[in-house]
Amino acid sequence: MGNIHTTGPNEALIVSGGCCGSTKKRTIVGGWAWAWWLVTDVQRLSLNVMTLNPMCENVETSQGVPLTVTGVAQCKIMKSSSYKQTDYHNDEADELLGTASEQFLGKSVKEIKQTILQTLEGHLRAILGTLTVEEVYKDRDQFAALVREVAAPDVGRMGIEILSFTIKDVYDDVQYLASLGKAQTAVVKRDADAGVAEANRDAGIREAECEKSAMDVKYSTDTKIEDNTRMYKLQKANFDQEINTAKAESQLAYELQAAKIRQRIRNEEIQIEVVERRKQIEIESQEVQRKDRELTGTVKLPAEAEAFRLQTLAQAKQCQTIEGARAEAERIRKIGSAEAHAIELVGKAEAERMRMKAHVYKQYGDAAIMNIVLESLPKIAAEVAAPLAKTDEIVLIGGNDNITNDVTRLVAQLPPSINALTGVDLSKVLSKIPGAKA
């Protein structure tokens, strides 16, 4: 009997031996294989990418300058990329992987990497001896391509494929690269200083031009902004005017409509008041009629009855009573006529007195007015002295001269006060009195 062995795409399965003394090897990648017990040998070979770091220390170049070069190489065991996989094995895969299996079968990945690394370092040393420092340092890609081109056939015969090879670092212990860099740096610095000066000059010119352009753009923009602002303000003013006009018209229309509504309301109120007054007049008229009927029932009819009784009594008392009543009525009539005549005469006398006073005032002028003033002075003095009537005690502080001065000043204030109250200049009136001094 036997076992079934499987493998993934990153691993090769090498099957050798078999029944009847077979010497054919089979290589399976990403498949499976049957192995008989005791007579079949099954081994595995990794197909993963191997990263190598070749390093050559103090290797002399063609100029005798010792350099140390480090690189990075990516390698893997070759296999076909176009073979057709079957369930058991593939002849092309057997052929391509046969060399690698012969070289590395049974070895670990570390041992395989060490073998490839030594081969790459040997070719790297050989190529370094044919190049100058400048060629190695300045054109690393060309150097790496050359190493890969030279080393590829050798590692290919071992069934190894170089996927990539790059130079990681180049340096030396004799300061050759530093010295080379200093000279180049000096040249570069010189050119750089000149370039900086020219660049500064060009930058200054360009900056001035840019600043001028920026200022032109700024001024142009400011001008446009001001124009737009002015247009905006003008349009806004026009819009505001239209809005205010519309608001004013709306307000006027509202006020007019409100006035009309108030007028209609007032008319309705007036109509209501008219109706109320009419109703009130009707009610009052009805009340008058009611009172008239009431008076007729309570006063007139009893009075008529009483008159009829008195008339009956008068007739009973015959002519004496009638004549007495007539005499009394005549007496009362005459008394009323006399009183009315007296009142009329008193009114006429009062009117005549007022007319005569007016005539006298008009004829005598200031004298009449003086008479009025003189008649009014006691009343004015009484009114002025009225508050003093409530005074219990008056204390005068100062000498007799002060009292005299106060009295004089008080008296001197009377004419202006009278003039302000009555419109009469008391000084002028008194000056017209014979023997008086103003």
Swiss-Prot record:
Lineage, opening ranks: Eukaryota, Metazoa, Ecdysozoa, Arthropoda, Hexapoda
GO MF term set: protease binding; structural molecule activity
GO CC, one annotated term: cytosol
Keywords tagged on the record: Cell adhesion, Membrane
Gene Ontology biological-process entries: cell adhesion; melanotic encapsulation of foreign target; positive regulation of filopodium assembly; protein localization to plasma membrane; regulation of myoblast differentiation
Domain of life: Eukaryota
Record SMART domains: PHB
Protein's UniProt name: Flotillin-2
Gene (UniProt): Flo2
